[in-house]
Amino acid sequence: MSSSRQNGMFIYPWDIAESGIEAVMQALQEARCNTAVVNSSYHQGRFFHPRSKTFRRLPFSGVSFTPDWSKYNRLRPTVHEQIAQAGILAKMKEACEQAGMGFHTWWVGLHNSTLGLAHPELCVQNIWGDTYTYALCPSQPEVQHYAKALFTDTLEQVKPERILMEATAFLPMKHGEHHEVCLLPLGESLQWLLSFCFCGACIERAESKRIDVGAVRLLVSRLVSQMVDADSISQVSAEAREVAFLLLEYPELYHYQQSRLEAVDQIWRSLKEIAQSMGTALDGFPSSTPFFVNQSYWEGVSLRKAAATLDRVVPLAYGDSVGDVAYTFHAIKLVAPEASLGAAFSLHHSQIRSAVDLAARVKTAVDAGVQSIVYYNLGLLNNRRLDWIKQANLAVEEWR
């Protein structure tokens, strides 16, 4: 293993506050990790922490530092006050520097139900007019201002070496709302079409490119209705190829999809300019949802554009097999052969079943040329799975 490769762990700041910096640093070192990737902006949720023997509930989406309020307009972040007042991020950065360990931050941009519920007019709106309140729309000027303000604020206050960006795009229609219930199968093409946003800003953007949005809406409405009515047809294997089929048959869908890609690319490039001006490397997930990396377009992300903007593309290598992991990097290299790569691994029980399983996936990523490996997530793992990370990292060292 190259000495420059970063072996990191995703860490929640509340885990640092609860366990103490010394214990967290010890856990990282025992797992043979040389980088702490500490969250600074996160969504709400309920999380099982096995070593703490607790379920932790985050009732709102928020940041873990006190913002510079002069930077913001209508959209203003909510603050995890205890974490911010305790200066957890600054203390963790200092501890990492003293230990010779890398300090990065992991930043969630537009996946914010707290702000979305307060400002539904700034969220993604599907063909039926439903509002996805967990997803601020990147085409909205007010949302763009918020993203740039929060990003700048984070870099100025947290001062990471690198920032890993998540959920700064169009989130898909299926994202795990509280008690999300659906009795019908949702095929890939149906989910893709229901991820299309038709808010005023997206319509204006598309019309400025001479796209007939009225025709697109009629087409999407018809296709979605047919797919819903067909029901079980979406379960046949051929359906997986339906998106490509529809893009070729209907140029208007292709052009509207390109408008979505450009909206995301615009905001990512603006964040890259900010990071570059402050001497911070910008890394990013191609998608915030762990589907195949070549489906990142569901969230309006072009792999080619992402690779051109980001300092490092870090896909969620969460597939069900080593072959899936290998394909992840193959797909990126097809469109961006010179891309700088990282890899994020989840130790979810449905995907990783042993230390050998994890090590095989990590080796696949290393063979693909990744420069960083990040494991999810320190607070969500028991000691057994933390040891799997140690074994995987030791195995990588042996392959050097």
PLM-predicted stretches and their roles:
Residues 309-325, 345-400:
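Substrate-binding cleft of secreted/luminal carbohydrate-active enzymes
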Residues 26-33, 92, 135-170, 305, ...:
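An active-site-proximal structural segment forming one wall of the substrate-binding cleft
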Residues 8-10, 14, 102-112, 164-171, ...:
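Aromatic-lined carbohydrate-recognition surfaces of secreted/lumenal glycan-active proteins
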Residues 38, 45-46, 235-251, 298-324, ...:
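Aromatic- and acid-rich polysaccharide-binding/catalytic face
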Residues 231-253, 283-289, 332-360:
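Active-site clefts of carbohydrate-active enzymes
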